[in-house]
Every structure is written in structure tokens, then in C-alpha cells.
Amino acid sequence: MKKNVKKNVEKKEISITVKDLHIRYRGLKKFSIKKSLLKMKTGRFEIFEALKGVSFEVEKGKILGIVGKNGSGKSTMLRSIAGIFCPDEGSIDLHGHTISLLSIGVGFQPALTGYENIILSGMLLGFSEDQIKEKLNDIIEFSELGDFIYSPVKTYSSGMYSKLAFSITAILETDIMLIDEVLSVGDIQFKAKSYAKMKELINDENRTVVIVSHSTETLRELCDEILWLHEGEIKMKGDCDEVLDKYQEFMDAIAAKREEDKKKEEEEVKKAIKAQEKKSA
């Protein structure tokens, strides 16, 4: 599939600078009821480092894709850029007037209606009430929510939530867009419409986009570069095809090892059953 790569920006201008970023959580690396109760009793929790000295830049007008297996720090990275998480060490510098994060479960007040959340979200993105009201009907129409726009967001399905979140960002058009798997949610018709709108938005050479997705096909088509995160660190960054090919090899190896371990476990169970049957005979 041919990539939708933007034209080169004449002068290199940096939109996002991440330098030696560390993000830490207090919690349990591996959950167990016994450990959890013990930590609650003693008041001591382990420190889990979600991001470990991550540094990279994104040029203005470029599209960066982020990949990595579950728990590698992808969503933490986006939330840090969006300002939801503060760095424990390091820094994040943004060179854009407005920034938006598209992610299921982030950004809306559940008790408020979809309509009210449009106003609130727009203000949080840095737009004036007049600017939001100018685009209000377009946002509602694009969302396809109809009268549900006047219902509390807590009553929405994940697909409805995704439609509203995407519509707000797509119509208000921020300078920096952060997208966390949101294009994978919703009905087929809306997916096609939102994907077409996304391609239109990212073709603007003044807009910088960072996308987290498990779809390597989508990333190959849309992105200029790929950042591969592994256990909170950068494993590789560079050309889309080169990085994604290496990443796919890595994931295939993990899947093959998992399948091999499963077969070994099944064989051990069969042997144990046969041994028990022989003993009982």
C-alpha cells in the first residue's frame, strides 16, 4: 500500500521535543490479592517506571506512529505529551497553540451530556466559546449521535464515545493531534468516514500527529516515521517499513514462543493424566 507521506517541510521546525523522560507509578508490577493486602497494610508500594529516559523529536507537519506490545508505555507516552501525566524526570516541550488527545476513556465528564462535553472539551483545548459554537452543528452532525447528544456521556457505548471524541478533534482541528487507538472503535461506516477525515487532517503540513495503533497496515500508510517502545524504552525509531518489519518479526517470535509453550503444557497435562490412569488401573 502506498504511504500517505507529506511533502518535505522546507525548514526543519520541531513541534514536539521529549528529553530524557521518566514517568513512574506507585503500585504493583504483578497483581495478587496477597501482595495487594500486604502493601495496603504496610503502606509500601513498589515504584513502577513506565517510561525510562525516553528522548525524541517530532518535526512540525510530520506523522509519528508509536508501536509496542501491551504495557510498553505507548499510552503513557501520549498522556504525558498531552499534559495528563507530569514528568518525574526530563521534559516535554510543545510548539503548538492547541493540542488534543483522542483516547477512549479520557477527556469527558460522564455526568454531562454530549453537548455539554463538546463545549467543555473545546475550552480545554484552548478554543473560545464563540469559536466552539461556530463549529457546534458541524461536530454534532459529524458524530451521527442524533438526539443522544443531549444524553449523559456515561450512557454512551464505546462506539458512541469514540464518535464524539473524534468529531470534536476533527472539526476543531488542533495544531497537534495525539491519537490512541480511537480509529479502531465504532461501526464500519463511521470508521471509513473518520479514516477519510483523518487523512484529510494529517495532509495539512502545519499539523503534527502522533498515532498509537496495533494496525501496522494503518501506520505504514499514514506515518512518516515509527517509534518502537519496549518496556518503557525506545527500541528503534526511523523509517516506517524498516521499523515495522523488525517489530512484526519480534511480535511473531513472541506468538511462536507462546504457542510452543502452550503445546508443551498440553503435552505435560496429557502425560500426567496417563500416569494417573496407569496408577489407578
Feature names for model-found ranges:
Residues 67-69:
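The feature captures the beta-strand-to-loop junction immediately N-terminal to the Walker
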Residues 213-214:
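H-loop/switch region of ABC-family ATPase nucleotide-binding domains
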Residues 35-37, 119, 131-148, 167:
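Conserved ABC ATPase "signature" region
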Residues 219-221:
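A short, surface-exposed alpha-helical micro-motif characterized by mixed small hydrophobic
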Residues 231-232, 247:
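Conserved ABC ATPase "signature" C-loop
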